[in-house]
Amino acid sequence: MPSPIPVERFLPRDLSPSIDLRPCSSPLELSHRKLPGGLPACSGRPRLLPPRLAWCSIDWEQVLLLEPLGSGGFGSVYRATYRGETVALKKVKRSTKNSLASRQSFWAELNAARLRHPHVVRVVAASASCPGDPGCPGTIIMEYTGTGTLHQRIYGRSPPLGAEICMRYARHVADGLRFLHRDGVVHLDLKPANVLLAPGDLCKIGDFGCSQRLREGDEAAGGEPCCTQLRHVGGTYTHRAPELLKGEPVTAKADIYSFAITLWQMVSRELPYTGDRQCVLYAVVAYDLRPEMGPLFSHTEEGRAARTIVQSCWAARPQERPNAEQLLERLEQECAMCTGGPPSCSPESNAPPPLGTGL
């Protein structure tokens, strides 16, 4: 489908033409290169974190590298121990083509610092340097959740996700989004590959390398809170909200759109789009192109419920999408229907909350 306008103006020049389904903070391509048990001493004066993040500075004497887990995007991840606890250590890559993007990715990861939630990967410690690599933009130590992602669960050899599991996983992700948005953080790269599966079959949102913080005060003024950085150029194009493709300000509703694509993937077990990237992007913006709703979204009551949720969350206008609070309440209702138990959301109303109203 030819594009009558230059779609390139919506795209960062260094965006890969292929679908990037790989996260930075979860296991990817295994490397067979041996690692030393420890890290070399820092050379020169180490770069320090700002005072507000001094609490999480890495004590390098307590770091012991165990094995590489993988690499992708802006970082390489290792299994390690820190103060006797098994952790994931992410070393941000030094990019010769875009060093600014590498630094921005590191500082964006720290948007999750101090945050504690069952469905958000916890940042344990961080450093603006790395021993033996003075050019490294930074190092982040995170909780170790294991080696699985939601992407691997959807597209691997496991049986398809049943309705109950789909809704439970979706509820975990929505709960994590609600927490992040309440704290003023927008993830901006939500997709199955960035949702880690932890022990207890818990979903945890990870890889905050594209995240941004909302500006304070906008909500009180009656508008939707926007990010401090008005334009967004990162993330995965298949999950990027139409308003971001058009260069409009970033709001938390962009994560809701990405959630819709993610839930669609959980149900369908298919990739969102095929074909030329620029044609897809133009069609998403100009013609409201969305992934096709197959029979799985219409043959059962659960499928029809998922269809309603997905369609409300990927509405073209951000104002028509639910916020994370409304989304979680609706998913709680659906989980209760799947399990036959009472809903665990607020008992103020037994009816599903209206979707697409408010922030």
Swiss-Prot record:
**Protein's job:** Serine/threonine kinase involved in the regulation of MAPK signaling.
- Keywords, sorted A to Z: ATP-binding, Cytoplasm, Kinase, Nucleotide-binding, Proto-oncogene, Serine/threonine-protein kinase, Transferase
The GO terms this record gives for MF are: ATP binding; MAP kinase kinase kinase activity; protein serine kinase activity; protein serine/threonine kinase activity
Provide the residue positions that the database annotates as binding ATP: 69-77, 90
Question: Lineage of the native species?
Answer: Eukaryota, Metazoa, Chordata, Craniata, Vertebrata
**Main location per the UniProt record:** cytoplasm
Q: Does the keyword NADP apply?
A: no
Q: Which reactions does this protein catalyse? A: L-seryl-[protein] + ATP = O-phospho-L-seryl-[protein] + ADP + H(+); L-threonyl-[protein] + ATP = O-phospho-L-threonyl-[protein] + ADP + H(+)
Q: Which InterPro entries match?
A: Kinase-like_dom_sf, Prot_kinase_dom, Protein_kinase_ATP_BS, Ser/Thr_kinase_AS, Ser/Thr_Kinases-Pseudokinases
UniProt-annotated catalytic positions: 189
Does the entry feature the keyword Kinase, yes or no?
yes
Q: What is this protein called?
A: Serine/threonine-protein kinase mos
The chain positions of domain Protein kinase read 63-336
Subcellular localization is given as: Cytoplasm
Q: Which GO terms describe its biological process?
A: MAPK cascade; protein autophosphorylation; signal transduction
Recorded GO cellular component terms are:
cytoplasm
The EC code for this enzyme is: 2.7.11.1
Q: What is a single Pfam family found in this protein's UniProt entry?
A: Pkinase
Q: According to its UniProt record, which protein family does this protein belong to?
A: Belongs to the protein kinase superfamily. Ser/Thr protein kinase family.
Give the domain of life: Eukaryota
